[in-house]
Amino acid sequence: MRSAAADTVSGIIEKWSASFNKLDADARASLYSKHAFFFGSNPSLYRGNEGVAAYFNALPRWSSPAVQFNDVRTAPVGADLINFAGTASFFINEGEPPLSVKITWVIAREDGDWKIVSHHVSSKTPLI
């Protein structure tokens, strides 16, 4: 039986994936907290859902984007806080191998809705 935390994360992943596949940066940014910290695929720290929107709007307009989440792990930290870790594989151009990264989110209830408050991706290739 799936937990409530797993169901919450599954719903966010579904919305996140749909907005990535459509290149809808504003819909994706709406999943983030107004207080979010965001480390994506470049070294900059983006803050708040406006910063997250700026990051997503600056990404290339890929020809056939798709994302797949695997190895999903969730852990409720409290009634209003969930940890998530997994692997995200980005298929950005048809025929090219995916870009796969480790991804973590901290998800919190904000104004009655679940929002991503911390987003971090890192290379699957060991750095050390």
Segments the model singles out, each with a brief description of its role:
Residues 1-27, 37-128:
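A beta-strand edge to alpha-helix "cap/lid" segment located at domain peripheries
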